[in-house]
């Protein structure tokens, strides 16, 4: 049952990510901004050929090599730790986010980013980035609370 739940979460995460990215591309000009919540959040359409804070900009080969490795390792750990809820949640979200951005990189050579925080200087990000970030936080909690790793 958990395998099916993991698959559903991954598919829903990818669909949400890809549908929203497509909406942004269709409705916002590249570089333009639409205010969503004044002084808090806006949508700014950018093409990101790197990672957060423009690290590895223009290094698509790095992501095209690294992402499948991360996915294989995450899938292996998901299989091994399926019964442990924190690992299950974290790894499932990481896989969904990694696949969402990987699909962009393979198809377009860049990732569509759109969420811009207005109240702090933070990189523009997307739904896949949110899934990855939350997944890594949950995985970190899983590792810290795992009695087997102590």
UniProtKB/Swiss-Prot annotation:
| Task of the protein | This protein specifically catalyzes the removal of signal peptides from prolipoproteins.
* Cell location: Cell membrane
Database matches in InterPro entries: Peptidase_A8 (IPR001872)
Question: Where does the UniProt entry say this protein principally localizes?
Answer: membrane
Q: Which BP terms from GO are recorded?
A: proteolysis
The membrane topology term of the UniProt record is: Multi-pass membrane protein
Listed under catalytic activity are: Release of signal peptides from bacterial membrane prolipoproteins. Hydrolyzes -Xaa-Yaa-Zaa-|-(S,diacylglyceryl)Cys-, in which Xaa is hydrophobic (preferably Leu), and Yaa (Ala or Ser) and Zaa (Gly or Ala) have small, neutral side chains
One GO term in the molecular function aspect is: aspartic-type endopeptidase activity
For this record, an example GO cellular component is: plasma membrane
Q: What is its EC number?
A: 3.4.23.36
Protein name from the UniProt record: Lipoprotein signal peptidase
Transmembrane ranges, per UniProt, are 5-25, 59-79, 82-102, 124-144
Entry's family note: Belongs to the peptidase A8 family.
**HAMAP family in the record, alphabetically?**
LspA
Record-linked PANTHER family: LIPOPROTEIN SIGNAL PEPTIDASE (PTHR33695:SF1)
Q: Which organism is it from?
A: Lactococcus lactis subsp. cremoris (strain SK11)
